Amino acid sequence: MIHRCTYIGSLVVLILALVPVTGCSPAIAPFSGCAYELAVDLKVDALRTMERAEEPFSKHEPRVESLQRQMKKAVEFARGRPNNSITTRQWEIMMNPEGHMVGGFLTRWKQDDSLSWGFIREASAQIEAGFDAIIGLESGKIGSK
């Protein structure tokens, strides 16, 4: 019984010793004005591009490719920042071509050539909420004003 108490006591001391060390390092990246602006710009560009999905995909392919390229830049920017795995994961979900966000929407548009207004409206609301989550996470980081 004495050994167990000593072990638990040592564990408590170790945890208390580590608290100041881990408490000083941020668990999430600080605010980045560049990341915030990029997310807002991509939200606007994505929703404007989606509005055109009633028309043939081929008519808007250059615009779609530009949007995809900009989103890849956003995920690479997020990935390159220390302690930014949550935001990086949000961008990966947003871009997933098999998912239900921008990547999946663009894949479906390309496959079907055009989409119904009802589908576009529903998808836009979901995707807008996804962008708002990314923007909200960034604006809530330490250092934002």
Which residue ranges define each predicted feature?
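Bacterial N-terminal signal peptides that target proteins for export
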Residues: 1-13
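C-terminal motif of bacterial Sec signal peptides marking the signal peptidase cleavage site
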Residues: 19-23
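Immediate post-signal-peptide N-terminus of mature secreted/exported proteins
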Residues: 24-58, 62
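Generic structural signal for well-ordered, non-transmembrane alpha-helical segments
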Residues: 36, 40-47, 65-72, 96-100, ...
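Sec-exported extracytoplasmic/periplasmic mature domains
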Residues: 47-54, 69-79, 107-110, 132-143
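Acidic helix-start/capping segments at beta-turn-to-alpha-helix junctions
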Residues: 60-68, 88
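Long, amphipathic, charge-rich alpha-helical segments that form helical bundles/coiled-coils
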Residues: 70-71, 75-123
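C-terminal partner/receptor-binding element of secreted or periplasmic proteins
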Residues: 117-145
